[in-house]
Amino acid sequence: MKKSFIHQQEEISFVKNTFTQYLIAKLDVVEVQGPILSRVGDGMQDNLSGTENPVSVNVLKIPNATFEVVHSLAKWKRHTLARFGFNEGEGLVVNMKALRPDEDSLDQTHSVYVDQWDWEKVIPDGKRNLAYLKEAVETIYKVIRLTELAVEARYDIEAVLPKKITFIHTEELVAKYPDLTPKERENAITKEFGAVFLIGIGGVLPDGKPHDGRAPDYDDWTTETENGYHGLNGDILVWNGQLGSAFELSSMGIRVDEEALKRQVEMTGDQDRLAFDWHKSLLNGLFPLTIGGGIGQSRMVMFLLRKQHIGEVQTSVWPQEVRDSYDNIL
């Protein structure tokens, strides 16, 4: 039992370390330290889809402030790039750990504990467009494939990912599968191509509903791009043969500029956020134009090691029935 546990931990470390090294080299970012707490009221917390309640923390020696455990570092990263004067084409990556206790499903792929490679880069002049987003997606997908090949060589786990990732807009997807739910659309398109970047998540589609929810103040999901489609963000999805479904590895996008921020908070009714320090800084032109995202660490390990449950590669909390159903939960 001990031997199996140690081997399991060595596999997890190998995937994480290998991916980290490739990501830093190929994406050309520096690894930095990030926070676990965010001060309430400065606007730095990631509100995700807007319905999740963060974990509140009171610090004894700072009685005049309340803090929250971060959901992600989407806004903190952009603030940090500005604070330390990162130039065009430069960026950072953080080994982020977060808690999302309002996760509506604790299942094979969802956990209260979230670990990500959280990255952000300053966009070069004239590159705030769909083509640059696709370049970044292809770079990250290359890192995923290189890591998969390294796992194949070390552990004899057959590589399954296609050489190229397929791009498709959410508007195209709803037209292609009008009678399917968003999740069913993801399953259909990802099973067909093996690896997909789904562009434009957050805005209302022709069927009157968004593909999925997104906060209005980090990703730009409203800017018109090509053929009347909208959105400069999206998700990297791969086909998970173990689960028989699409499997999200990363959410990423070009971040809002001043106009996109104002447009999106008006659409979601979140204009009150513009009073926060972070949002004021953006509106006053103090932040660079950036692109960034989060890549799930435990999800990546789970996929590349062909595990059935995310609890096999991370230590978290689970209902007893989940522990009873899976022998290898950590």
UniProtKB/Swiss-Prot annotation:
Enzyme class, spelled out: ligase
GO cellular component: cytosol
InterPro entries the UniProt entry points to: aa-tRNA-synth_II (IPR006195), aa-tRNA-synth_II/BPL/LPL (IPR045864), AsnA (IPR004618)
Keyword Metal-binding (UniProt): no
Keywords, in A-Z order: Amino-acid biosynthesis, Asparagine biosynthesis, ATP-binding, Cytoplasm, Ligase, Nucleotide-binding
Name by which UniProt lists this protein: Aspartate--ammonia ligase
Pathway recorded for this protein: Amino-acid biosynthesis; L-asparagine biosynthesis; L-asparagine from L-aspartate (ammonia route): step 1/1
Catalytic activity: L-aspartate + NH4(+) + ATP = L-asparagine + AMP + diphosphate + H(+)
GO molecular function ontology, one term from the record: transferase activity
Domain of life the protein comes from: Bacteria
Main location as per UniProt: cytoplasm
Gene3D superfamilies listed in its UniProt record: Bira Bifunctional Protein, Domain 2
A single BP term in Gene Ontology: L-asparagine biosynthetic process
EC number: 6.3.1.1
Organism listed in the record: Streptococcus pyogenes serotype M49 (strain NZ131)
